[in-house]
Structures are given as C-alpha cells and as structure tokens.
C-alpha cells in the first residue's frame, strides 16, 4: 500500500485513496506507522473536514503507536477492544484513567474463552466499569467462524449461524448507543 491516511493528510484528500467496503462505508488505510510532526499538525484540520462529510468516523488504531495519542485527542469517544488477561486489563484501566471515563464509549472484550482466568478478568472489568456509563457488552467469543468471515471479507451479520447471535448483540449494543447519543 503506497497511499492512504498519511498521504491524504499531508498531500491532499483524494477519493481514489478510499476503499469502498459497502454502500456508504469507506476505509482509508494507514500505509505507515511512521507519522511526522507535519502529519500531526495537519491531522486535526483533516478530521474536521471529514466530520462535515461523514456521519461517523471510526479510527482503528494500534495502541502502541505514538500517533495513538493524537487519534485519542481528536476523537469524540473511544471504543476499546480488549482481552481478558492481566496486562491487557491493566492497560485498559490505564487508558480509562488517562483519558477519563467520559471519553470512553465502550469496552469490548474480544477472543474470549470461557476459562477460569478469563472469567476472573471479565468479572474484574464488570466491577471496575460499574457506574461509569461505559458500554460493556457481552464478550465476543473466540470462534473460528468469525476468523473465517474476516478472511473472506464478510461481517458477522452476513452469516446465519446461531453461534454469532451473542457477537451480533454485543455490537448492536455498542452501535445503538452510538446512534442514541447522536440523536
């Protein structure tokens, strides 16, 4: 990938840089994890223009990237995908403390296995998030079906499998709260 978000911010937006996923759903990939000071300065203006053009903007960021702080600053709210293990639990709590619970829309546990340890951290998340207003849906189970759908460019809504009902409901909870807040 030679051109994406970085190119659009630095050299001008161009519809050809976007990948159309579905009707009214576009993806602007990040072609590099290296962002210059110039990118950071121009990013706010770029996002403000996108806010006018789009109803919703989702930034899928790698939490270890330095630019992640910039993405967090310009976001209205964050959806944090996480796992049920000690280090990820602690890291998630650190993000909540750093940005404030009011900046966090949802915390979604992914690749959940019904093990003693994961159940323990799920309960810890529940306890920690109680009364914060953060949306905390049922965890997304680790399923090979989901992995296969992703590999084939499909979503969990494009399968009739009953195994996906919990995952669909979890995402529906998050989406409905986003729409509800916007209305």
Where are these regions (language model features)?
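P-loop NTP-binding core
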Residues: 1-183
């Amino acid at each position: 990938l030679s051109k994406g978000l970085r190119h659009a911010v630095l050299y001008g937006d161009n519809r050809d840089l976007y990948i159309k996923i579905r009707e009214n759903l576009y993806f602007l990939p990040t072609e590099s994890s290296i962002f210059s000071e110039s990118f950071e300065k121009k990013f706010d203006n770029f996002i403000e223009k996108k806010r006018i053009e789009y109803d919703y903007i989702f930034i899928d960021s790698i939490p270890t990237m330095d630019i992640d702080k910039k993405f967090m600053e310009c976001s209205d709210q964050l959806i944090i995908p996480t796992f049920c293990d000690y280090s990820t639990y602690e890291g998630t709590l650190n993000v909540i403390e750093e940005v404030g619970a009011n900046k966090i829309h949802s915390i979604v546990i992914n690749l959940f296995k019904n093990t003693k340890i994961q159940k323990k951290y799920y309960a810890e998340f529940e306890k920690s998030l109680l009364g914060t207003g953060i949306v905390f849906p049922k965890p997304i189970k680790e399923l090979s079906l989901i992995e296969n759908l992703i590999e084939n460019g499909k979503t969990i809504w494009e399968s009739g499998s009953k195994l996906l009902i919990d995952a669909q409901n979890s995402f529906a909870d998050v989406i409905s709260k986003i729409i509800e807040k916007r209305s």
